[in-house]
Amino acid sequence: MATTTRRSTIGLALAGGGPVGGIYEVGAMAALAEALDGLDFNEFDIYVGVSSGAFIAAAVANRLAPSSLARMLVEDDTEEVFDPEMLLRPALGEYFRRALSVPVLFWTALRQYLSDPWHLRLIEAFQGLSHAIPTGVFNNAGIDQLLRRLFSSGGRSNDFRQLDHRLFIVATDLDTGESIPFGAPGYDDIPISVAVQASAALPGLFPPVLVGERYFVDGALIKTLHASVA
């Protein structure tokens, strides 16, 4: 009696490491694809990405070959080019929102101090002003904008549910510290580009990304590689 052999599930998990780490991952995949006959990174079953690895995983899951990504990231000879300067744009909206909160925070602190000046130290009363400090210096919304354009053509999709392969983008819930795998059931209804933006929102450098009613930051805060998600 003939027997059939069930093919094992193959997954690709990509870690963080900033722009340099992402370029390294793309270069390694492009080199392996060229050296090993039959190796096609676009035909894996599962893709998991975190931080800069989220950008690469989302692109490869959308059938962008490592060689094409290399040209986009390094050689600048494609229509869509990743410009690192887009990550260095000031978070002006964040600055403005925080500046608007200063008067309210100041008068609240002053009122609190004057209500009990004998027992409340001045520094304790005014510590609430720390909420006016911006949560990020730069704006990483360019990631969302670039990926939206990239995934809107060539048969690609910005919807987890429309991909041919499973994709998980890991980000960290700012309030609970929980690692959330976007793309899993219950977390697959947001755009892939927004999930990648959230996964790469390094605290202090970029503001948290609001998804629904929750704020998310860099998925590498808990661990840099989330292969177990697969």
Language-model features: where?
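Patatin-like phospholipase
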Residues: M1-V50, F55-A230
